[in-house]
C-alpha cells in the first residue's frame, strides 16, 4: 500500500518501507467525502465517494420511490452536487414510479469558483428540471432524515447525499 510519493526523486514509498522508482506515474487512488457533519446513525445518508456508495444510493432511491414520493437533499455546492442532482433527476424521470423532489444545499454560493456565465447556465438547467438550490447558509449537522443549518433551520429529507468537501486520500497530503 502506498504511503507517500516523492516527485523530486521519482520514488513511491510503500507502507512496508519498500521504495519503487518510476519514470512516469499515474495515480488513481480515489477520494473521499468527510463525514464530520454526520451525527448518530447514518441510515439513508450517502457520500458520493467512493463510487460504490452511489450504487447503494441509487438502489435506495428506486426502492423508496416505488412506494411513495420522496425528498432528497444534496449537500455541496460544486460540480459533484450539480452532476449528481442531474443524474438523480434522470433516474427519477425514466426509472422511478414517483419522481423525487431534489434540493441542493450549497453553502454560501452554488458553483462559486466558476464564472457567472457558467454558474447561471447550470442553475438554469437545474431549475427548469425542478431542482431547488439553496444558498447563503452552511450545514451544521446531519442526522438521518434531518439537515440542520447554521441558523438552526431544519430541512427534513428522506435521503441525504454528501457531495461537499471532496478530499484526496492521504497519500497526496504526505507527498
Positions of the model-derived regions?
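FAD-binding core/adjacent interface of flavoenzyme oxidoreductases
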Residues: 1-73, 161
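A Rossmann-like FAD-binding core segment of flavoenzymes
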Residues: 3, 92-175
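Short, glycine/serine-rich, charged loops/turns that create anion-binding
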Residues: 33, 79, 109
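Glycine-rich, phosphate-binding/catalytic loops in enzymes
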Residues: 42-45, 90-91, 121
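Flexible, glycine/proline-enriched loop segments at strand-loop-helix junctions
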Residues: 44-45, 75, 109-113
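Internal, well-ordered alpha-helical segments in soluble enzyme and binding-protein domains
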Residues: 53, 57, 80-84, 118, ...
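Rossmann-like NAD(P)H-binding beta-loop-alpha module
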Residues: 57-100, 105
Amino acid at each position: 500500500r502506498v504511503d507517500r510519493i516523492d516527485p523530486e526523486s521519482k520514488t513511491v514509498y510503500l507502507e512496508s518501507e519498500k521504495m519503487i522508482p518510476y519514470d512516469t506515474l499515474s495515480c488513481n487512488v480515489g477520494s473521499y467525502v468527510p463525514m464530520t457533519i454526520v451525527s448518530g446513525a447514518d441510515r439513508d445518508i450517502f457520500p458520493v465517494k467512493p463510487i460504490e456508495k452511489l450504487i447503494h444510493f441509487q438502489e435506495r432511491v428506486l426502492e423508496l420511490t416505488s412506494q411513495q414520493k420522496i425528498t432528497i437533499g444534496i449537500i455541496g455546492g460544486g460540480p459533484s452536487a450539480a452532476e449528481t442532482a442531474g443524474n438523480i433527476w434522470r433516474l427519477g424521470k425514466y426509472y422511478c414510479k414517483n419522481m423525487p423532489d431534489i434540493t441542493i444545499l450549497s453553502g454560501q454560493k452554488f458553483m462559486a469558483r466558476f464564472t457567472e456565465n457558467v454558474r447561471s447556465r447550470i442553475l438554469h438547467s437545474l431549475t427548469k428540471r425542478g431542482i431547488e438550490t439553496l444558498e447563503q447558509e452552511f450545514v451544521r449537522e446531519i442526522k438521518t432524515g434531518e439537515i440542520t443549518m447554521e441558523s438552526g433551520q431544519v430541512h427534513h429529507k428522506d435521503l441525504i447525499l454528501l457531495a461537499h468537501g471532496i478530499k484526496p486520500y492521504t497519500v497526496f497530503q504526505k507527498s
